[in-house]
Amino acid sequence: MPEQVLIRGAVAFDPEAHGFAFPNAFVNEVLTLPNGAKITTAGRCGGMAYVSLDYFLAGQPAPRWRADLWAPSRVPPDSHWLARLFTQRLRDSFFTGSAAKFVTWSMHSDDETWVFKGVRRWTKEEELPRVIRSIDAGRPVVLGLVVARDLASVGHNHQVIAYGYEQDRESGRTTVQVYDNNSPGRAVTLTSEQGQSDWTASNGHVWRGFFVQDYTPRRPRVLTRNAPDVKDRVSTGDTVKLSHVWTGLTLHSHDRPYTHRGTDGHQQVTCFGGSDDNDRWLLVGTGGTAAGTALRDGSVVRLRHLSTGRWLHSAAGVPSPLSGQQEVSAVDTPDATADWRIEVVDERPWTAGARVRLVHVATDAALHSHRATDPRLTAGQQEVTAYPGRDVNDWWTVLELS
């Protein structure tokens, strides 16, 4: 039997489905100097790689929020649960035995010496076989990519997920398929020819070498298994789950009244960090608008909480429990205080991927949330209010659509 010349292996990891739709454009504030200047570092690549692999191994889709939700920054802010998770998992990636190679390899040459193999041979003789064995066993791996040549440049190294490979034994060329969170939504390859000491990435980078990182999976937070297509139109008669853009939590209500001073005692409305049927709202048209009418910037709707049958409501002069802004509650009977005007970025039709405000028609206050909670007054969940001004905490997007 002739020797097989071209050898391939791959795992069913798809960067489009299992990666994130926004780039690794995070800026981390490490220190604030006495003069107010901020010391920053760039990126959370290891956290994004670890979290993406967490979702894949759990058999769950990664959250598919798009970069334009957080324009102009293009990434979830630090108030968002996903951004905080990236930070936690980035730290996890550094507190592994293999992470020391980011430092040691950055201080070694590409070529072998009397004592050490060097980065080229370490990669091709030790780490590449580990990648191949893992992929052949059906398991993607986190790779540490090394470009630095001194300690001062260690921060330029990178972390990705390897999920496929191809080896041409005749030419000596090896290609590794990776999810690179600097290039969202597309496959990236690392290629090295037989006599080549480094690895050329299809997205323009050149890496000295790579190693397999130690990784322990963590159960991911799953808010939906049925994310809509971002282009799906939203209409009256639809049932939605709405996600708060700046924190990632879900608009929620439960059969429990407000009890704080000055309240009207109606049903609490909060933002919830999990996912259940108490997050589902029916969009109902006003003024005889028929079900199935496409909604757009300027449309007015009412939101009926499906679990309790009550209506999203607000009223002037009633304080919210924690911030003292205008209270948002759910009431038995709808009237003009249950009317909400839709404001869509760029005055477009309302689609599932759009960033929208819901503005209370009677008071012109925007549906709003922020990271304030109380175990008694909001059941430990995030306060939802109607805010008379406008800021980033007023934005919402569709998490589920049915």
PLM segments and residue spans:
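Short, flexible loop/turn elements at secondary-structure junctions
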Residues: 26, 46-49, 145-149, 164-169, ...
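Boundary/junction segments of secreted and surface-exposed precursor proteins
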Residues: 1-24, 231-239, 243
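Lectin-like carbohydrate-binding module/patch detector with strong preference for beta-trefoil
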Residues: 227-402
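Active-site-adjacent substructure of cysteine-protease-like catalytic cores
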Residues: 120-176
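Cysteine-nucleophile protease catalytic domains, especially the papain-like/related folds used
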Residues: 8-125
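Active-site-proximal structural scaffolding
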Residues: 38, 124, 136, 155-158, ...
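Short linear interaction motifs
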Residues: 25-32, 36, 123-127, 136-146, ...
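Cys-His-centered catalytic/binding microenvironment captured across papain-like cysteine peptidases
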Residues: 153-157, 166-231
